[in-house]
Amino acid sequence: MGSGGEGLAKRDFLQITDFSRKEIEQLFDLAKRMKARQYRDTPLSGKTLAMIFAKSSTRTRVSFEVGAYQLGGQALFLSSKDIQIGRGEPIPDTARVLSRYVDGIMIRTYDHAEVEELARFATIPVINGLTDLTHPCQVLADIFTVKEQLGGWEGKRIAWVGDGNNMANAWLEAATVLGFELRLACPEMFEPNIAKYEAAKKTGCVMVTEVPEEAVEGAHVVNTDVWASMGQEAEAEARRNAFKGFTVDRDLMKLADPKAIFLHCLPAHRGEEVTADVIDGPQSRVWDEAENRLHVQKALLATLMS
């Protein structure tokens, strides 16, 4: 049952900058123990996570639902069509009501302002499962994968090739907190959020270019995402034209460090943002990356909801 009482102390996770470097490192230590099956606690016993989906998903839904179950709790799937928020009920009302019923909320939606409003009025933890602005849970899992595969992010160059979308913005948030080198290659008019970029420049070594080769040169991690995200289907053809030359292929990967790894948050469109021989090749770590969503989010749930 939810905490119910107004004003009780709680912690939300809406963007990566909500956590300090030390907190992220502690989260990763816990996720590592969970992945190694060295963690046997059930901190979510008797607790329920409400999962609100305005955007459909495979990895977000399954990883959070399985994660809650493995921690002793349960997850309640709520599509926007199933609850009154989809019919115009004010978000503050939904936040207050859910706070009386459940112990945490994960929301995956379009408008980031909706997540902020939900968190402002909920008295239980709110987790951003994705918005059009940022995708913090995914990038946490990506950085955990970098640490797992390469030993850490210190001294590593991370490259992003493609749309300056919510994933690129979340990488900028991570660079703000962790201070690693980040190079983003995006076509003109598809650059990342300017506020995220300016914040990252203050603490990290960050560059935005229109030339993919500049971003990938010497990189230890090469990242990309689909060119047209969910809700942008009408723009797909125009985006394909705009992103010509931004495909991560074998020739582009040759410019990276010889031991570089390739990451993609999935779903992937082979032949568009990445070629099959890269995403299915020996440098790809996308399946480890996808698995790590489960472990990192379990650590997040245990931290926020226990």
Segments (PLM) and residue ranges:
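Positively charged, low-complexity intrinsically disordered leader regions
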Residues: G2-V62, V66
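Phosphate/diphosphate ligand-binding glycine-rich loop within oxidoreductases
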Residues: Q38, T42-K147, R270
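Adenosine-phosphate binding glycine-rich loop
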Residues: K259-A260, C265-S306
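Phosphate-coordination loops involved in phosphoryl transfer and adenosine-cofactor binding
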Residues: L44-L49, E154-K156, K259
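Rossmann-like adenosine-cofactor binding region
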Residues: K201-D277
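Glycine-rich phosphate/diphosphate-binding loop of Rossmann-like nucleotide-binding domains
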Residues: A54-V66, E148-T224
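Short, structured coil segments at secondary-structure junctions
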Residues: L71, Y101, F121-A122, L178, ...
